[in-house]
Amino acid sequence: MKIKNIDSIEVLDSRGRPTLCTTVVLDDGCKGTAFVPSGASTGSLEAHELRDNEERYGGLGVQNASENAKKLLEDLDNKRADDQASIDKLLIEIDGTSNKSKIGANAILSVSIACTRAAANSLNLNLYEYLNILYKKQSNLHTEMSMPRPMLNIFNGGSHS
């Protein structure tokens, strides 16, 4: 289950803002795809979302982040997609900044999530089952999965609506 290809394109999110769609392909043909739309507001300590700052889309384009995501194949080629901790550590090391501003948090996150989904598909597992396996491995807890409890907002407003 080794990484063989990474493709990333600019797409529009539900608010018409550019975001990344990244697909990771494994040597067994399995794929994982991730979209990483940004929030309506950002905090001062959040990871840096790389934007093009050009005329297109009022400076919000993500073509540079898309290219950065594709270039990550140079470092991730033939890496095991099911070693999520190593992949994430390597992505952070490659960026080398505290706020992920060199490659862009959007590029890093899209590749990370796409790898996770590709690994789950390769193991013929639902994503939630695969994430549970990763959680148990990381935490050394061996609790049984249970039905999730919904968490939702009753009232919304402001920049998040």
Question: Which residues make up each language-model segment?
Answer:
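Flexible glycine-/small-residue-enriched beta->alpha junction loops
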Residues: F35-H48, L125-S161
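Residue-level signal for helical boundary/lining positions with a hydrophobic bias
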Residues: M1, I9, K100-K102, A120, ...
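Metal- or metallocofactor-binding catalytic centers and their adjacent structured scaffolds
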Residues: A40-L125, E129
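Gly/Ser/Thr-rich beta-alpha loop segments that engage phosphate groups in nucleotides
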Residues: P18, N106, S159-H160
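Short, Gly/Pro- and small/polar-rich lid/capping loops
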Residues: M1-T19
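Glycine-centered tight beta-turn/hairpin loop motif at sheet-sheet or coil-to-beta transitions
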Residues: D27-G29
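Short beta-strand scaffold segments in enzyme catalytic cores
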Residues: L20-V24
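Short glycine-aspartate micro-motif
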Residues: S8-V11, K100, I108, E144
